[in-house]
Amino acid sequence: MTELPDSTRWQLWIVAFGFFMQSLDTTIVNTALPSMALSLGESPLHMHMVVVSYVLTVAVMLPASGWLADKVGVRNIFFTAIVLFTLGSLFCAWSSTLNELVLARVLQGVGGAMMVPVGRLTVMKIVPREQYMAAMTFVTLPGQVGPLLGPALGGILVEYASWHWIFLINIPVGIVGAIATLMLMPNYTMQTRRFDLSGFLLLAVGMAVLTMALDGSKGTGLSPLSLGALVLCGILAIALYLKHAKNNPRALFSLALFRTHTFSLGLSGSFAGRVGSGMLPFMTPVFLQIGLGFSPFHAGLMMIPMVLGSMGMKRIVVQVVNRFGYRRVLVATTLGLSLVSLLFMSVAMLGWYYALPFVLFLQGMVNSTRFSSMNTLTLKDLPDELASSGNSLLSMIMQLSMSIGVTIAGLLLGMFGQQHIAADSGASHTVFMYTWLCMALIIALPALIFARVPNDTHKNAVISRRKRSTQ
């Protein structure tokens, strides 16, 4: 890194700030949801669309971001991503209704979807191959710090200012980043194949419509007949994509990916696994504030042990998988995460608040081990010519499954809860207890998929390399 030219180091700093902005925004919002609900006149149990709108937009836009960067240029797309993200943040802060906030989060998600993959592509183009790993480690470190700072920073801003400031802090950073991008970043372009617009639109419609339908009649305000039509529309769109992609070399995601058995198992397990674990970052701060009466600041602080456990486990996950094999690790961590989530609820209901940080630290460790194992299992056996496409599909599935997880969490809260519940009341405890039981079951179910993973026949020599490609 030290022998790189000054201009290249500045370009890496720009990419690193983009990673930081995007990752910070994934966790800073969760702590503020109850305060947002109070300000907007909504029930805290119905605020999940603030999270879903952002994550789902990222999932939908991810497949197009790399192609746009190659076609239009990395500087132009990265600048556009920062501008859209910053404008989305401004509109979020100006929002006076939940619908306005959701629309602003969609705009923010479009920028966020382009920021990280285009940033990775930028590093690939400006750094020599032998220094690529060191450069990626440098630019992704702020992305790991963002989730750590997000909950606590969100809690501080909500408690001592207002929820609007969790979005307003993005604006000066975004302005500086946009100016620096125009001044310092070269506009690399590449020859690209024709973009599969038909496949992109079919997948986008299918993902968005099915996620909306999951929100139910209470969330969408639609009749059961209209919801049924949405489901049919989503299924039809996915079916049409499968027909479109069959024997199509220009398809957005080739169906040849699924000829690799471990990819099929890993992708289905990753989808099901992240539906369950995607509920936890949303549910935990909401439960701490609405269920236990914690302040936003203290709820944010309680999330830090979970992130610390996750970051700490990344250092030894390679050895764990090589020692015990994928099947044992994935089945054990899936069932373990379900048990730890039940332990968290039990400790909270018993009033042993001093033990909650330890439980959350353990939850972070188990979750991190499972995530890394799922990622590498999915990609490790793909042929080189399909590795990039497989990685893109996995990234999209990761975002989609998390949005579905948050949607299901909101659906469960709405099903068990009333329109408005008082903080730290018996009614709220009952609502969260039933929701947590359902969530623990959903978290455990992917163990049935991972039990089908074949026994490892050799030590995994590529887990470390593949794991970094999915960070």
From Swiss-Prot:
Membrane-crossing ranges are: 12-32, 49-69, 77-97, 102-124, 138-158, 165-185, 197-217, 222-242, 263-283, 286-306, 342-362, 396-416, 431-451
| InterPro entries in the record | MFS, MFS_dom, MFS_trans_sf, Multi-R_MdtD
Which superkingdom heads the taxonomic lineage of this protein's source? Bacteria
Keyword Transmembrane helix on entry: yes
The answer to whether the entry has keyword Zinc is no
UniProt keyword list: Cell inner membrane, Cell membrane, Membrane, Transmembrane, Transmembrane helix, Transport
Q: Which PROSITE patterns match?
A: MFS
Q: Name one Pfam family in it.
A: MFS_1
Membrane topology (UniProt): Multi-pass membrane protein
Recorded GO molecular functions are: transmembrane transporter activity
Q: Which GO terms describe its cellular component?
A: plasma membrane
Location in the cell reads: Cell inner membrane
Family statement: Belongs to the major facilitator superfamily. TCR/Tet family.
Q: What is this protein called?
A: Putative multidrug resistance protein MdtD
What is the organism field in this record? Answer: Citrobacter koseri (strain ATCC BAA-895 / CDC 4225-83 / SGSC4696)
